[in-house]
Amino acid sequence: MLRPLGWQILLTPFYSMADQLSYVFITPAALRKGRAGGILGRLISRSGLELHTGRIFAPSAKTLGELAATLSGQAKTAAYLKGLSAGSQSLVLVLKGEDAAAKVSSIVGNDDSMNGRGETLRDTFGDLVESAEEGGKTVYFEPGVIAPASAAEAAAGLKLLASASDSEGGILDAASTFSGSTEKTLVLIKPDNFAFPNTRPGGVIDLFARTGLALVGFKPFHLSVAQGEEFYGPVLDFLVEKLPDGRAQWESIIAFMSGKRPSECTPEEKTLPGTQPCVALIYQGPNAVAKIREALGSTNPANAAHGTIRKEFGSTIMINGAHASDSVENVARETGIICLEENDFKTKIAATL
């Protein structure tokens, strides 16, 4: 039976209704080198904040300059942003919760906190090389991750990013960074990774980094029951044919992903966003579908290979860490069902600021 006792309790929202947002800007170098998962995992687990939204950006020179201007007291960071090539792909994560700006700033660090022993995210994921012979002159500076120092700076940066999110963000394209043909594939980080603030969501992304694929799409969302019915529609006939309680098993899958069983909902309730947090990722590169499926592992975690997502993070056939599309055709079908192209980044920010 695929309906484990108590999962509804474990996966109910664990965040209070806080009213402050902050953000982190994961730099192009950190994104390209597969550091985004480590950054996300530590950020969530250390802060206890909600991952409110996020988006891949390819910011223009104008946006980079204006973002730099919102960061006071971080001269190196401001100069770094202004010096980035326009269109360099980066990842913006928006965190929500009590004292979000102060918590995020403390965890990420700033220009003056990059020579410690891993106390801040910049310690671990950034690099600062200074020349002792030249009076501490900066030889190399790569922050890895950038955060505003105050709620006012966070609000200014978020408004700027929200306004640019249509034209400079979304599901981007990294084909030019690979030789030969590429394809895109979809991953869903499942709700079991969000039972409490922990490193698991970042750990999933971290393990996918070994594929060498480019992360070109990122969207936290809540699957509705109606979307779940359509998404998992193709497996209903199989379950009904193979199992005496096949339909009940199918409803359990949808309830796990959305928070409610279809038979418990009115037609109107089915269309509402679910209660269970998920994150959709788009990866791009040669043979992306096959590479992601290999890194994901067998549906049953007990049979999954060592080092795969499902071996590391799964516990049952249903609660198994992540979903990945099994064909290019299903990538198109599944991304359409969850409305991945829709930009809710700016609406979520506008609703809170």
Annotate the PLM regions.
Residues 13-353:
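Non-catalytic terminal and connector segments of soluble metabolic enzymes
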